[in-house]
Amino acid sequence: MDEPMPKAKTYIDQIQAPEELTDGDFWKNPFGVEVECDDLRFLYIPDHVSTYISTQVARQVYRYQVDNICTKEQITHAVMITMGGLLPGVQLHDHLAWTLNKNIPPIEFGTMGVKYYAGPGEPLDEPRILHALSIDVKDKVVGVVEDLVDLGGTANFVAKYLQSQGAGKIVLIAPFLKSKGDIQHISQVISYGYVPKDTWIITPREKVETLVKRVPYWRDRGATLSTCEDNLIRIGYPSYLIDIYLRATYERG
């Protein structure tokens, strides 16, 4: 007798899977979930999944370093773009800031704060530098670390700025892409997965931020407190965050 086909995993199955059962193939092309009173889909990234993805990205960076031993175009410096690039940047630092291979240079990490978008897919009239570049990039091969590349605006702006500071080759490093956009000043892109353009990614650094921004939006579109709670549960929010923030945000947000 034929064995029954295994049941396809649902969105919530993937979100709640324990660390040792992380499905790497799913997270290369993940799908979000629909909720009431919103046109966007939402994709909740658990902490351990964020760590897993950064590890896979670090492996790609290491492979890039090995492939460029002879070209002398190995990455020696990396710029984390705040705020989004801080979490993946710190996770990458754990893998790449030192090395046991004498042919692979350790990467020096720094930061730069840039605001390019007012909201998802909504670029500002002019990008703003919020925090100055913290490391010297003159004549260096530089990795630019972001959490997500949407239209490519931030990455392109930062790459152009770094080149104005004397940087050589620019390599974009990001866990997720929505598109490569019009990236004119970047030689190579290292990433892990693609997400659809209609999907709002909720990384571990912005769980509360997303909740306090989206709950009032749902409320103003007719959602009750109960509907907002159902939305958050459907997205994958843990009960402790819902208990702390939902009612206060709904009533005063």
Language-model features and meaning:
Residues 1-253:
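PRPP-associated nucleotide enzymes
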